Amino acid sequence: EVWSSSATTLPKEDDKSEFDKNSVLERFNYQLKTSGLKTVNTLRPNFSWASSDIDEIKRKYDLKKYILLFPFCSPHLSIKKWPYYNDLIKLIIDKFGEEFKVITAPSSKEINDAKKFNAVCILDNEKALDISQLTKLIQDSSFIVANDTGPAHIAAQVGVRGLTLSG
């Protein structure tokens, strides 16, 4: 049994440092193909199937145009936490006024932390959104700003414009 990686699948004559300059998706596609798998959608991933209807939540919070912030991170990765979200929120409100609502959608463990930010905390019946609700909230946002965390990766997969920040 051989572990499949770029190190094990790349021909000896190819330079790994050059290969590593390719995008993650291109490298992943190469690895899958050389392992004998068909790769129809690897270079064009589509995560939109993972979203659910959140119209009721959007009505409750009057969400039309909104900027979604994810100022959270895993407790053991606090180095990734950017400390200036409230400053950013003030800049957004000063520039756009009520044109965009500034919101956040914490996980169940982040609900108390969300109170530290001057953003509307989006919950479903006082509970954190599930992954499909979160995906739809991200998908419908005007822009996203996040620490290097799961929602930032979801935003990339559903094609939402945004910015990922680190400490």
Show the residue positions of the predicted features.
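Catalytic machinery of carbohydrate-active enzymes
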Residues: 1-167
